[in-house]
């Protein structure tokens, strides 16, 4: 026999009907309860994921060509900290080193480029930052 203060089997757990307590029921489960009860809320029907339209998915996205490391492609090209024009290609307009996902360098040559840029900065060939803002 259920105790009167615990609510019956169809009341939604501890604390009576729609208490918002621990049980399931209409109150919304663990601490949910609150305003209006039920599961609708004020968000309306959002529909299933399938009904939202958009692309069918599958396949690759159109990112264009894969970037190739210019130092691996042209074996004659070497990373040189003294070549300011070459090193500026791997710097943003604010003086930051461009990451390899954008520059297309392989890991080996990206490390060499970063080291060369840092050497060039120390010798005042390349800027640490851009001048006045």
UniProtKB/Swiss-Prot annotation:
A Pfam family it matches: Ribosomal_S18
Cellular component GO terms, alphabetical: cytosolic small ribosomal subunit
Record key words, sorted: Ribonucleoprotein, Ribosomal protein, RNA-binding, rRNA-binding
GO function term, MF aspect, one: small ribosomal subunit rRNA binding
Gene3D superfamilies membership: Ribosomal protein S18 (4.10.640.10)
Keyword rRNA-binding: yes
InterPro entries referenced in this protein's UniProt entry, alphabetically: Ribosomal_bS18, Ribosomal_bS18_sf
Bias-annotated ranges (Gly residues): 9-39
A biological process from GO: translation
Ranges of compositional bias, category Basic and acidic residues: 40-59
Top-rank taxon, per record: Bacteria
Function summary: Binds as a heterodimer with protein bS6 to the central domain of the 16S rRNA, where it helps stabilize the platform of the 30S subunit.
UniProt xrefs under NCBIfam families: S18
Name under which the protein is recorded: Small ribosomal subunit protein bS18
Naturally occurring in which organism (per UniProt): Anaeromyxobacter dehalogenans (strain 2CP-1 / ATCC BAA-258)
